[in-house]
Amino acid sequence: MTTVDLSGQVALVTGASRGIGRAIAQELAKQGAKVIGTATSESGANAISEYLGNGGKGVVLDVNDAARSVELIDEIQKEFGAVSILVNNAGITQDQLAMRMKDEEWDSVIATNLTAVGRLSRAVLRGMMKAKTGRIINITSVVGSSGNAGQMNYAAAKAGVAGMSRALAREIGSRNITVNCIAPGFIDTDMTKTLSEQQIAALLQQVPLGRLGAAEDVAAAVSFLASPQASYITGTTLHVNGGMYMN
């Protein structure tokens, strides 16, 4: 099997303090990339710096802060070079039945999970175009394809990211920049650890492989899409869900 080598690459991973984002940041650093991971708090950023060590650092970023997002891209370029791998992982949920959902619950999920993804993607384009290479990898969700009761806002945002990614892939493909999505299913994270055995058993009835995925499964998919081996893959969604959703 060919080993992934990302030496010389500069990766920005949002929402990297724990869970899937942490696994992604660690995997990219292991493959040789210089990784900048974001968190919403100073303590989260410090945790990222600690686990990355010489492989990169953590920074504080609210992805909804438009000015700060653009500033961060400039700061990374000055310190490490232009971002060559962007992983849009940061996201939130505010689940509610449609009839009870407030505009604020809709707006905040769309802002964080869709608008901010588009903003950061646009912000890294100049550097990628100048280098004539780049990887944009957006973490979506099985919910964006299958839907889920109580998650109308979340499903809309994640489906929107998939559509946006395809449009952007067509627009910038000639510059040797790929844009893809990874859609995780049920992944074993802090969130699933709060579920009862009965709840997990019910979830697993929907998964042909019969188990929860690991954050490392998603990280491996990101590593592949970031690698030279995936240079002819763009505008697609890679489903990492144990067969829960198939198309």
Question: PLM features: residue spans?
Answer:
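Substrate-binding pocket helix/loop in short-chain dehydrogenase/reductase
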Residues: L97-A98, K102-I110, T192, L203
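Residue(s) in the substrate-gating loop at a strand-loop-helix junction
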Residues: S141
